A protein has these predicted regions:
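Post-signal-peptide N-terminal segment of Sec-exported extracytoplasmic proteins
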Residues: 40-77
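Short, well-ordered, aromatic-rich surface patches in folded extracellular/luminal domains
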Residues: 97-142
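Positively charged n-region of N-terminal signal peptides that target proteins for export
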Residues: 1-11
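Secondary-structure "cap/kink" motif recognition
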Residues: 26-49, 124, 130-142
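Bacterial signal peptide processing site
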Residues: 21-24
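Solvent-exposed, acidic/flexible segments
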Residues: 54-61, 86, 126-129
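Short, structured surface segments that line ligand/substrate-binding pockets
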Residues: 74-114
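C-terminal motif of bacterial Sec signal peptides marking the signal peptidase cleavage site
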Residues: 15-19
Length: 142
């Protein structure tokens, strides 16, 4: 009888530890963006246009990167494609690294159902504050 109580205790303990470890929906993972000093330039363009804007000013690069990092909240949703699906209009940000020519990191900004999002391919989807979205998209209007 003591043997069964001991086994039950061990199994319940394992169950408790594994249940506490799964926090998929409540995760608060942070977006991984390059450091501003490692970025040579940022290309900003709409998916519907070939024309875009190239930002090379280091202060502007830092404002954009920090703005995204500080104003996003994890949605818990996964990104499983190279670009957003079922979204007709989005903004592409390409971060060109100083030491990695030809291989920029990419994020997508878009609006869906009155909310604004940042999607990093295969890393996740984050909710973005509206004012930050508007500030970044205003670069395309200049």
């Amino acid at each position: 009888m003591k043997k069964y109580v001991g086994i039950a205790f061990v199994l319940i303990t394992i169950l408790i530890f594994t249940a506490c470890g799964s926090n998929k929906n409540g995760s608060n993972k942070k977006m991984v963006l390059p450091k501003a000093e490692e970025v040579k330039e940022i290309d900003i363009m709409k998916n519907t246009s070939e024309d875009g804007l190239k930002i090379e000013n280091q202060d502007e690069i830092e404002i954009i990167i920090e703005g995204i990092k500080e104003n996003t909240n994890d949605t818990g949703r996964e990104s499983v494609n190279d670009q957003p699906t079922n979204i007709n209009d989005y903004i592409i940000l390409k971060f060109h690294h100083k030491n990695a020519e030809g291989s920029p990191s990419v994020v997508y900004l878009y609006k869906d159902k009155n909310s604004h999002y940042v999607e990093q391919p295969y890393a996740g989807i984050w909710k973005l504050r509206e004012d930050t979205f508007n500030e970044i998209s205003s670069h395309l209007i200049k």
